[in-house]
Amino acid sequence: MNSPAETRKNLCRICDSNDYHPVYRVREMMYGLSEEFLYFKCVQCECLQIIKFPEDMSRYYPKGYLSFATDPSCFYRKPIERWVRRVRDSYGALGKGFLGQWIEKFYPAPEDLKALSRISLTKQSKILDVGCGAGTLLYLLYEAGFSNILGVDPHIDRDIEYENGLVVSRQEVQEVTGSWDLIMFHHSFEHMQEPLKVLQSVSKLLNPGGCCLIRIPVVSSFAWEDYGVHWVQLDAPRHFFLHSLDSLRILARKEKFHIEDIVFDSDEFQFWGSEQYKNGISLRSEKSYSMNPAQSIFNQEQIDRFRRKAMQLNRDARGDQAVFYLKKN
C-alpha cells in the first residue's frame, strides 16, 4: 500500500535532510474534491510532509468545517445536563473528585479533555488553546471552573465572545502575549506551515515548568503502513506535516524542549475512514459512516472490531494519533 509514485530530491523542513525521498500522490477526500497533492517522506526523520503549500487554503476550510461548526453552548441549556457536564469535566481535566469519577464511568469525557489530567493543573492555571476552532474544548473547561483560558485560531471569521465569558480570538500564536502554564494544540499543529517558528513562540510564552501539549496524527503507525495514501488522517492538503516519533523529537530538541511523555489515543476512525477512502467514499458523502451510519458500508460488529483493534494498537504504541507532552530543558 505504501509504494511511492517516484523518488525526488527535497529538503526536509524538520531535520534538514537534502536527499532523494519517496514521493506520494494523495487526493483530497474529506469533501471528495479528489485534487492530487504531492507529499514526500523523509528518509532520515520519516516525517511525511506536503511538497508545496497551496496558495489559497481557504477553499479547504469551508463554512461547516469540523472544528468551526459546533456551538458548544448548546450542551449547557438544560440545568441538569449543565451540572453533570461540569462535574464530569472537572474530573476529566484534573483527575480528582469521586462524583466526577462516577459520572465519567457512564458518561465519558472527551479524549482531548482527559489528556489534560496528566498535567499538574489547577482551576487557576493559565491555558492557551492554539488552533481551537470555535473553542469547544475551552468552553467545557470554562464551564468546569477554569477561568484563565484563551483560544486563538487564525481561520475563524471574527473574534468569538461567549455569554459565559470565554473568548476565542482570531489571531496566530505569534501574536499572543502574556505567559501561560499550558499551551495546547489539539489536532492543529499538523495544519501549520512553520512548526519550528510555532514552537519558538511557545517557548517564549510558557511559564517556567509549563507544558506544551501537542495532539496529532502520527505516521509511525499501523494505519499508514496498511493504508498508505488512503490513510484518513493524512487529510491532504490540510495536514502539512504527518510527524513520526523521531521527527517530533528532532523538532522539540531544536527549540530545547524534551518530550516528557507520549500517550497514544487513536480510535476506530483510522479504520472506517481509511476503508471508505479506499472505496472512493469521502468523509462528507451520504454513504459515510460519519454522516449516515445506516447507509454506510459498515455494520456495528465491524465498528466494534475496529474499536478493539485501535485500543490494542494504542497499547502497542502503534495507533495513528498520540498526545505529546513537552517541557523545556
Question: Which stretches of residues belong to each language-model region?
Answer:
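A short His-aromatic
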Residues: 187-191
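Short conserved AdoMet
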Residues: 122, 193, 207
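A short glycine-rich, Lys/Arg-flanked "PGG" loop and its adjoining helix->strand segment in the class I
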Residues: 196-213
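Short, glycine-/aromatic-enriched active-site segment of Class I SAM-dependent methyltransferases
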Residues: 212-241, 246-252, 277
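Conserved N-terminal segment of class I S-adenosyl-L-methionine
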Residues: 1-186, 196-199, 264-265, 289-298, ...
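Substrate-binding/catalytic lobe of Class I Rossmann-like enzymes that use SAM or dcSAM, i.e.
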Residues: 245-281
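Feature marks short, surface-exposed loop/turn motifs that line or immediately flank catalytic pockets
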Residues: 158, 219-222, 266-268
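Short N-terminal helix/helix-N-cap motif within the alpha/beta-hydrolase-1
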Residues: 193-197, 224
